[in-house]
Each structure stands twice: as C-alpha cells, then as structure tokens.
C-alpha cells in the first residue's frame, strides 16, 4: 500500500518540500536561518493577530489601547513584547541569512535571490508601519520624517506625501491606513515566502563548498528537521530572555510619551535594524541624494550577481574575500552605531566614511579582489 504522505494532493506538497526533499549532505548551521525566519514570521502573525483584537487604530485611543493591552489583557504584556522583540529577532535572522548568501555565493540562484530582496523590502515596510502604531513620540515623528522623504521625488513629491498621509500631516487617516497595511502585509510576505521556496526547490540548495551536490543528497527529514529544531531552541532562548528580563532594551524611551505634533524629540531615530540605512541617508547632505542612497543601500543586493568575478562560487577557499566580507560586517555595525548618534562632529564624518566604504566594498573592492584571487589560483 502506498503511503498517503506521498499520494494525497495536499500532503504530497508538504512531503516534497519538508520530508523527502533531497538536501545537500554538508550544509552547515548557517543554513538554519531560513527555517528560523519562517518560525519568526509565524510568531509575528500569531502575536500580531492577538494584539489586533485589542488595538484601536485611532489617534485619540491608539496609545492608551497599547497601555490597556499591557495592563489589563491577560498576558497582554507578553504578547506585546514577544511581537516587538520578535521583530528584532526576525531582522537579526534576516541579516545573517543575507550574509550567508553573500559568503557562500547563494546569489547565483537568481530567482530565489531576487524574491529574497523583494521579501526584505516588504518586511522592512511592514516593520516601519508597525513602529508607527503605538502612537508614541518616536512613532509619530518617525512616520513624519520617513514619509517626508518621498517629497524629494521630482514633480510629484509633495502630492505623493499628502496622498500617503491622507491629509496635510501625519494624522488619523495615516494611522488607519498604516494599521490596514501592517495587518495585510505579513500574509503577502507568506505568499512571497512560498514563491521563494518554490524557486529554491527548483534548483536545490547551495552548500558551503559552492559545488554541485547532486552526487550526495540526504532526505530533509529527520536530519535537517532535528537540526532546525535545535536552531529554533537556540533562538527562543535569547528571545525569551529579552521578553522577560529587559523587554524595552531595544526600544526607545520616547515611545512611552504619547505623540505630540507640537513637541519634536531631540533625536529622531528608527528601530536598531534600520539604523544602518538611516546613517547612510543622513550622511548625504542633499535630500534626494540621501533618499537614493537609502534605497540603493538595499537594492545594491540585486546587482551583486552581476559583480561576481570570482571563479569559485563560495568564499570558503578565498581568504581575501572572506576578510573583506567581515570588514563589510564591521562597517554595517559602525553604520548602525552612527545611526543612533546625534548629528554632530565627529559622528557626521564617521558616518560619511562608513557609507563610502560600504558602497566601495560592494561595487569596487570585492570584485577587484576576486579577480586577484583568480590569478592566485594559477600560482
């Protein structure tokens, strides 16, 4: 008798994706982050759903409804902080996932990589709109500053901003539409994730050596399901530590003050996971130039496959490229730190140097060093 798992139309899809999927035998723990991202997405959707049951998207009651969730709803504070810190874990996994793709040359799977970039933009948009919902000072002013960037668009800039605001300033209409988009986008993200997996399973996964692994495959279950579960437990530990011991560690104290359009905070800054892009934006004195640099700082990932000059796909046996990638990581950490500092000397200069280094590394230095490494193969 044939197994229902392999014959039923629904279970057949699950079976070919997560059970009998042929996977390379040598993929390391760096490949765990895809499944961790899936777990984070599920956590965000579930906690978000429960928060939406008690939240009101109205400027007069939004702030107090969040306070009500934390004070009066059974375990509301746990749900709220799981959602807020879950977003931080989501982005941490995202950045590592992208970094692993760069290190091991996974960007050569172009469809999977491009859908991944679309996913990154969508998740960033969702997180930004979610940050506006508690309607604290940083929520309001963050929304004002970031949406105002669109006014740099030639000809239609002002109309575009007013269209997004639903008026002449960030107000009730803005909050309502941000809540609507914040609610629907995770489901759109889920659809994109399915397409991402579809394209990945068309080609098969990459591996640390960057060589074809068709000659040596193992079933996904039980080997990688157990491995992913270990990763999940190791992710839950820091998340729970954050939620139960210092839930506001990654937040901004200004967001515990209700939004006040008449009082600007001394330092407007987004959540930590946007600070690198925010630092790049601020390092350019021109408004339109800053906006373009901000967009290009993430969109640059799309042209990385075109800049691949190395003969080896993976960086595993390319020590110079490895060194440069870790310099890039250090540079991004520097940008993240700068994004959280005041706009004054010496932070302005450091931010500008770090921004120049970021683009130089990706566009010029790394492709050049890859060519040098190609020459070194003949020595």
UniProtKB/Swiss-Prot annotation:
The keyword Transcription regulation does not apply. Heme b b562 binds at residues 83, 182. A ubiquinone binds at residue 201. GO terms for molecular function: metal ion binding; ubiquinol-cytochrome-c reductase activity. Keywords: Electron transport, Heme, Iron, Membrane, Metal-binding, Mitochondrion, Mitochondrion inner membrane, Respiratory chain, Transmembrane, Transmembrane helix, Transport, Ubiquinone. PROSITE patterns: CYTB_CTER, CYTB_NTER. It is a multi-pass membrane protein. It is found in: Mitochondrion inner membrane. The chain crosses the membrane at residues 33-53, 77-98, 113-133, 178-198, 226-246, 288-308, 320-340, 347-367. Gene3D superfamilies: Cytochrome Bc1 Complex, Chain C. GO terms for biological process: mitochondrial electron transport, ubiquinol to cytochrome c. One of its GO terms (cellular component) is respiratory chain complex III. Heme b b566 binds at residues 97, 196. Binds 2 heme b groups non-covalently. Its main location: mitochondrion. Pfam families: Cytochrom_B_C (PF00032), Cytochrome_B (PF00033). The keyword Cytoplasm does not apply. Its cofactor is heme b. PANTHER family: CYTOCHROME B (PTHR19271:SF16). Component of the ubiquinol-cytochrome c reductase complex (complex III or cytochrome b-c1 complex) that is part of the mitochondrial respiratory chain. The b-c1 complex mediates electron transfer from ubiquinol to cytochrome c. Contributes to the generation of a proton gradient across the mitochondrial membrane that is then used for ATP synthesis. Belongs to the cytochrome b family. Heme 1 (or BL or b562) is low-potential and absorbs at about 562 nm, and heme 2 (or BH or b566) is high-potential and absorbs at about 566 nm. This is Cytochrome b. It comes from Indri indri.
């Amino acid at each position: 008798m044939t197994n229902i798992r392999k014959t039923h139309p629904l279970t057949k899809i699950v079976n070919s994706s997560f059970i009998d999927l042929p996977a390379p035998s040598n993929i390391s723990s760096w490949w765990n982050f895809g499944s961790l991202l899936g777990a984070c997405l599920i956590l965000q959707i579930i906690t978000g759903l429960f928060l939406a049951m008690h939240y009101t998207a109205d400027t007069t009651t939004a702030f107090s409804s969040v306070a009500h969730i934390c004070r009066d709803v059974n375990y509301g504070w746990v749900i709220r902080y799981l959602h807020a810190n879950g977003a931080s874990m989501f982005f941490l996994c995202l950045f590592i996932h992208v970094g692993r793709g760069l290190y091991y040359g996974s960007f050569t799977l172009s469809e999977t990589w491009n859908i991944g970039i679309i996913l990154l933009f969508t998740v960033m948009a969702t997180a930004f709109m979610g940050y506006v919902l508690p309607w604290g000072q940083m929520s309001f002013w963050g929304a004002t500053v970031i949406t105002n960037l669109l006014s740099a668009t030639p000809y239609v800039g002002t109309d575009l901003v007013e269209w997004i605001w639903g008026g002449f300033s960030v107000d009730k209409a803005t909050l309502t539409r941000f809540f609507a988009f914040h609610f629907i986008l995770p489901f759109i993200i889920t659809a994109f994730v399915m397409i991402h997996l579809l394209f990945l399973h068309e080609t098969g996964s990459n591996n640390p050596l960057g060589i074809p692994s068709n000659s040596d495959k193992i079933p996904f279950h039980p080997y990688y399901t157990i491995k992913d579960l270990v990763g999940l437990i190791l992710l839950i530990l820091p998340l729970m530590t954050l939620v139960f011991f210092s839930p506001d560690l990654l937040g901004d104290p200004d967001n515990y003050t209700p939004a006040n359009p008449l009082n600007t905070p001394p330092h407007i800054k987004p959540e930590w996971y946007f600070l690198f892009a925010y630092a790049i934006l601020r390092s350019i004195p021109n408004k339109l130039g800053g906006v373009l640099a901000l967009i290009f700082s993430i969109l640059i990932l799309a042209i990385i496959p075109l800049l691949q000059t190395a003969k080896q796909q993976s960086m595993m046996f390319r020590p110079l490229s490895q060194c440069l990638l870790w310099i890039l990581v250090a540079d991004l950490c520097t940008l993240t730190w700068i994004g959280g500092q005041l706009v004054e000397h010496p932070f302005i200069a450091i931010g500008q140097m770090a921004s120049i280094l970021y683009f130089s590394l990706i566009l010029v230095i790394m492709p050049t060093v890859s060519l040098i490494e190609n020459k070194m193969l003949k020595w």
